């Protein structure tokens, strides 16, 4: 796939310097590695459908995706480079988004920590016990009382359900698997200016959708640490997606038995069924692809729809 990139006030240069993407600027926040969204759609990099938009392929060749139902391609895959803190934010569920955001999908997402600085933390959840306490904390700017920060390290995996207050802190790079939605409600943005003006906040919507009380951390921290070698391991299966991780040393194989399988190479290089792949590559293995033979030293994060 040919990715889509975004420039953000919190972005940096790792997407170019570390992942090798040819994109200018020192504020590159996101690589949309697999995307078929009105705000950005990838094009096919090579092969039979070279140059076509993923969104068009989804509409015209649904057989490649196991005849999966749905008006829009269901998932969106990003690499996010947070040089600075992202806003404290929350996403709506499908019902709220459909009613208030012109029929959009809601946004469930999950994060695989690709890299982070020592002693890094994420904002996951909040400390309000009741909705009244939440409103008081938000309306009076009691952010240190409100937000819940957790330490994280490379290799951690975190699930972010709709309604979860969250933020990626500076110095963290993640691979994000999410519903195909671009709806974000900002709760707090550190009073930063963008083009000389504060960025828009969405206090009413945020208070509408934030889950109170917050889910326990055990519901969010799904997996942590090193994985087994040469084995496609499931990290999570939820309502919208399944996510897998594999660390390949020398060679490995598995059967692509899903309607389709999205693959992101997040470390190293090698070959997949004889085709060269490297860090930063994103691709889709279509329905009935069959056996996947991997050679080299590389790390993959893969995903598909829940069945």
PLM segments and residue spans:
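Transition-metal
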Residues: 1-129, 191-218, 243, 302
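Ligand-binding loop in jelly-roll beta-barrel domains
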Residues: 72, 80-85, 116-119, 164-184, ...
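A short secondary-structure junction signal
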Residues: 100-101, 122-125, 136, 169-172, ...
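A short beta-strand-loop-beta hairpin characteristic of the jelly-roll/cupin
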Residues: 119-153, 256-278
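C-terminal amphipathic alpha-helical segment
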Residues: 185-251, 257
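Hydrophobic, well-ordered secondary-structure elements that form the walls
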Residues: 246, 268, 280, 300
């Amino acid at each position: 796939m040919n990715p889509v990139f975004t420039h953000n006030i919190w972005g940096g240069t790792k997407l170019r310097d570390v992942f090798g993407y040819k994109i200018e600027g020192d504020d590159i926040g996101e690589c949309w590695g697999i995307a078929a969204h009105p705000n950005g759609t990838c094009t096919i990099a090579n092969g039979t459908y070279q140059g076509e938009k993923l969104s068009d392929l989804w509409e015209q060749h649904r057989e490649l995706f196991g005849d999966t139902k749905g008006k829009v391609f269901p998932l969106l895959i990003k690499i996010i480079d947070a040089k600075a803190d992202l806003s404290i934010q929350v996403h709506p569920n499908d019902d709220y988004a459909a009613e208030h955001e012109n029929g959009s999908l809601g946004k469930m997402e999950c994060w695989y920590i690709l890299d982070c600085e020592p002693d890094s933390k994420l904002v996951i959840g909040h400390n309000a016990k009741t909705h009244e306490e939440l409103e008081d904390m938000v309306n009076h700017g009691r952010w240190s009382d409100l937000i819940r920060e957790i330490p994280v390290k490379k290799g951690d995996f975190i699930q972010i359900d709709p309604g979860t207050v969250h933020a990626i802190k500076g110095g963290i790079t993640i691979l994000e698997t999410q519903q195909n939605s671009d709806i974000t409600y900002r709760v707090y943005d550190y009073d930063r200016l963008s083009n000389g003006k504060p960025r828009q906040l969405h206090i009413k919507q945020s208070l509408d959708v934030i889950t109170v009380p917050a889910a326990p951390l055990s519901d969010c921290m799904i997996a942590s640490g090193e994985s087994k070698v040469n084995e496609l391991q499931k990290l999570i299966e939820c309502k919208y997606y399944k996510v897998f991780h594999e660390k390949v040393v020398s060679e490995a194989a598995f059967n692509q038995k899903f309607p389709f399988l999205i693959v992101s190479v997040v470390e190293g290089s090698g070959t997949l069924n004889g085709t060269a792949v490297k860090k930063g590559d994103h691709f889709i293995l279509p329905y009935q692809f069959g056996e996947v033979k991997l050679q080299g030293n590389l790390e993959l994060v893969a995903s598909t729809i829940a069945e």
